[in-house]
Structure formats: C-alpha cells, structure tokens
C-alpha cells in the first residue's frame, strides 16, 4: 500500500495538493493507494485561502466537509481507500460521485 503522507512535514496547500492531483502517478506503480487527508491542516488552508493553516482556522466539522469532497475526488481518481474521521459524510460523498458518473 502506498500512502503519500499528506500533511506530514507538509503543512501547506502547495505541498499536499500536488500529491492528490498526482494520484495516477502513485496508481501507476500497481500498488493500492491510501489517501489520509482527514482534517489535515492543509484543508484549513484551503478554506481560508491562507496557503498554510493558522491557529484560528475552520472547525473540525468544516474540515470534515472538505474531507468528504476530497474523498469523493480521490475515489474518482482511483484511490484504494481513504482514511477519515467522519465515515458517514465521506461515504455519502463517494456514493454521490459514483451515482453522478453512472448517469453521465
């Protein structure tokens, strides 16, 4: 299993989003890819537009909303699994994305 290590020593958007948008590169190795983006600081930075997260960032619930969106996008791009705190929210987002593709 490959885990790109989102957030570890990489607090900013500029270090984490390329790992997500480059998911196909990891998949090309033939190993399953695990995305562990749940509640990471870079999600706060995405919501505030600050580049890196500050102490007064979004709530965990707000981070969970973005985590769910990133889970759906990760699934769409072939992630084998995602690690999340709010399973129900991410599951619903992945189901919605899969349903969308069925009717596209």
Feature roles, as predicted:
Residues 8-104:
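Active-site-adjacent loop and "lid" segments of alpha/beta metabolic enzymes
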């Amino acid at each position: 299993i490959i885990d790109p290590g989102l957030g570890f020593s990489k607090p900013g958007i500029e270090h984490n989003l390329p790992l997500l948008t480059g998911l196909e590169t990891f998949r090309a190795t033939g190993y399953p890819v695990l995305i562990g983006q749940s509640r990471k600081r870079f999600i706060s930075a995405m919501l505030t537009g600050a580049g890196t997260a500050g102490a007064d960032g979004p709530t965990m619930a707000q981070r969970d909303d973005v985590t769910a969106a990133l889970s759906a996008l990760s699934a769409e791009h072939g992630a084998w699994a995602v690690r999340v705190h709010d399973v129900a929210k991410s599951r619903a987002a992945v189901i919605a994305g899969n349903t969308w593709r069925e009717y596209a």
